[in-house]
A protein has these predicted regions:
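Secretory targeting and sorting signals
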Residues: 1-32
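Disordered inhibitory propeptide/activation segment of secreted metzincin zinc metalloprotease zymogens
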Residues: 31-155, 235-237
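Metalloprotease/metallohydrolase-associated module, dominated by Zn2+-dependent proteases
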Residues: 32-58, 62-69, 79-81, 238-241, ...
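Extracytoplasmic/secreted cell-surface and envelope-processing proteins
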Residues: 155-157, 260-263, 285
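Metzincin-family zinc-dependent endopeptidase catalytic domain
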Residues: 162-276
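Catalytic glutamate of the conserved HExxH
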Residues: 276, 280-284
């Protein structure tokens, strides 16, 4: 018996056409999604990823966004990241990027560049007479647990010296230590855990990179203007109010600046490690920079070379902490 014949040439053409139509219909839902706002390669600016855009429509999580010399890696939805740099000339330098739970981007910038001028400290109010402060919209609701990086330290500073300076700095914030007669009403807590080989999530260009879940204090290279930098990550607090701190890393720029734990009369340009650390600890616990005209507060954007005055808090520094940790 002869085999069954297939469709003729016209039949095959019709069959092929119907198959192509069917596959096209089936593949509609599988086509790759085109980003609503395709982004250029490399670093982005805040104009490339403007406020109101979405990191979901514009695939931006993990990309670096820059503004005025500072930079941040875009965090996952539901997260805020901030960069705060202590600069040699006292100029405020940093910004904040928030990604809402739905992926929407928003920014906050320091209001003005608080440039220190010659004679500024002499003209500014005394620390115990100056009630100015700024807060960053976040706080540590639990205990801030931090690690000391195991990297190279400045000449003449041992690991024990560095740990002691950092612990004293953090304790100055949590206990609101001051010479103004203000009692401690700040319910903030911290604990040093150990030394770690992990690094602060801050690169040599003073940019906050993606967080690793560890709060690390270390030394290394930063942008030439930054004496030290704090990067902080937070998320909305369940009950509202300031955001809940997730991680805060601190790096001291030992590539471009000298540090000491004991400034003496011979000091000309070294920064007191404990003073700088106290300023950075203020950022960790939610304080922002005090502006021009407030040069004698710990949270002014420069700790001033060879000065130990920032080791203790001024009135405004204490009031800022009280406003967060009631």
């Amino acid at each position: 018996m002869a085999g069954r014949r297939g469709p003729g040439r016209p039949g095959r053409a019709i069959t092929a056409f119907l198959l192509a139509v069917t596959l096209a219909v089936l593949c509609v839902g599988q086509a790759p999604r085109t980003p609503a706002c395709p982004l250029a390669r490399g670093e982005l600016t805040v104009d490339d990823l403007p406020a109101g855009s979405s990191v979901l429509d514009c695939p931006a999580v993990g990309r670096v966004v820059t503004h005025d010399g500072a930079g941040l890696a875009v965090p996952a939805p539901g997260t805020t990241v901030s960069v705060d740099a202590l600069t040699a000339d006292g100029s405020a330098h940093g910004f904040t990027l928030t990604v809402a739970a739905d992926g929407t981007v928003s920014y906050a910038y320091e209001a003005a560049r608080a440039t220190a001028v010659r004679g500024g400290r002499a003209d500014a109010p005394a620390p115990c007479a100056d009630a100015a402060y700024a807060t960053a919209g976040r706080k540590e609701y639990g205990t801030y647990e931090w690690f000391l990086g195991d990297g190279r330290l400045p000449a003449g500073i041992s690991r024990a010296d560095a740990r002691r300076a950092f612990e004293e700095a953090v304790a100055t914030i949590t206990a609101s230590r001051n010479d103004c007669g203000l009692d401690d009403r700040v319910a903030a807590r911290a604990r040093h855990l150990s030394t770690t080989s992990s690094k602060a999530d801050i690169d040599r260009e003073t940019r906050c990179m993606s967080p690793d879940g560890l709060s690390v204090w270390d030394t290394g290279d930063l942008g030439a203007d930054a004496v030290a930098t704090t990067c902080s990550w937070s998320r909305p607090a369940p009950g509202g109010g300031p955001e809940d701190l997730l991680e805060a890393d601190v790096r001291f720029n030992t590539h471009d600046y000298a540090f000491t734990v004991d400034p003496s009369g011979a000091c000309t340009r070294a920064y007191d490690l404990r003073s700088v650390a106290t300023h950075e600890a203020g950022h960790v616990f939610g304080l922002g920079h005090a502006g021009a005209g407030h040069e004698n507060l710990t949270m002014f954007a420069s700790s001033f070379a060879c000065s130990t005055s920032a080791r203790t808090l001024g009135k405004g520094d204490v009031l800022g902490l009280r406003s967060l940790y009631r």
